[in-house]
Swiss-Prot record:
Cofactor: Mg(2+)
Organism: Listeria innocua serovar 6a (strain ATCC BAA-680 / CLIP 11262)
The protein's name: tRNA dimethylallyltransferase
Region (Interaction with substrate tRNA): 36-39
Family (UniProt): Belongs to the IPP transferase family.
EC number of the protein: 2.5.1.75
Domain of life: Bacteria
């Protein structure tokens, strides 16, 4: 069976992935699968820079607004859903295009990636849940440094699961993770967008300003009023900082500046992930040749299939 060609567009937040994905979809008869772990949630629109129907410009998109914030959409679920979508899109004669910045989710699609399918120990999990996120992450770092490198301290649920698997199996959680062999079903072209660091940070700061103008405070306030502040999906950048403001522990300007700062740090982590974990063909973003260069790479890739 021939491998399914898939275009994958990755890069840090605010670098221009969405625009490029639309261009490629129009030129190569593609359909787009979102590779963003936050855009799957309904009601998280402004804070996740979710693509609008107008921006979709008639291109079919998947894995956007598929579940409520209180219902976790895990990497394992993303892997299963995306693999099914790739096959469906390909079988209809279209080109599957994945676009996003969630490295773990995207990588899981193309590599033989396990998720620690050990059974549960609810009592142990409750015990861990009483600890603060910093203590938990430090425990993981001592027991399994490789996993600690890949799981952010703020992802408390994921850190707890890693510790639970170690507790149950006696093996590092990282052993269940990536095997660096591509899944035989797919032939991906990984395109990465990069931008001068200062220019990227300027874009991020402007994007946050625009989010506030578009109503981010109101969007976060609705989630706050619905008592969703402890839901893992809501603890993402752009929401958690405003919850601190709603609690009276910061000013609105301080919350905005913290969102900008955290977004810049997140972009740096994204770039580190993609550069260290995936074999990516990098393209300079924000220049007149960005789209043309990407299209030439896709043409060459498809011609070789």
């Amino acid at each position: 069976m021939s491998k399914i060609p898939v275009i994958v567009i990755v890069g840090p937040t605010a670098v221009g992935k969405t625009s490029l994905s639309i261009t490629l979809a129009k030129n190569f008869d593609g359909e787009i699968i979102s590779g963003d772990s936050m855009q799957v949630y309904r009601g998280l629109d402004i804070g996740t820079a979710k693509i609008t129907p107008e921006e979709m410009d008639g291109i079919k998109h998947y894995l956007i607004d598929v579940t409520d914030p209180a219902v976790p959409f895990t990497a394992a679920k993303f892997q299963a859903e995306t693999r099914g979508l790739i096959e469906s899109i390909h079988n209809r004669g279209k080109l599957p295009i994945i676009v996003g910045g969630t490295g773990l989710y995207i990588q899981s699609v193309f590599y033989d990636y396990g998720f620690g399918n050990a059974s549960e120990d609810k009592a142990y999990r409750r015990e861990l849940d009483q600890l603060d996120k910093t203590t938990l992450w430090q425990m993981l770092d001592q027991l399994d440094p490789k996993s600690a490198e890949l799981i952010h301290e703020n992802n408390k649920r994921r850190v707890i699961r890693a510790l639970e698997v170690i507790h149950l199996t006696g093996k590092p959680f990282s052993e269940y993770q990536v095997h660096h062999t591509l899944n035989e079903a797919y032939q991906p072209l990984f395109l990465g967008l990069d931008l001068d660091r200062e220019l990227l940070y300027e874009r991020i700061n402007r994007r946050v300003e625009l989010m506030f103008e578009e109503g981010l405070v109101s969007e976060a306030s609705k989630l706050y009023d619905e008592h969703l502040v402890d839901v893992p999906a809501i603890r993402g950048i752009g929401y958690k900082e405003l919850f601190t403001y709603f609690d009276g522990n910061s000013s609105l300007e301080e919350a905005k500046e913290l969102i900008q700062k955290n977004s810049r740090h997140f972009a740096k982590r994204q770039l580190t992930w993609f550069r260290n974990r995936m074999d990516i063909d990098w393209i300079q973003a924000g220049v007149s040749t960005t789209d043309t260069e990407a299209m030439e790479k896709v043409k060459t890739f498809l011609a070789s299939k």
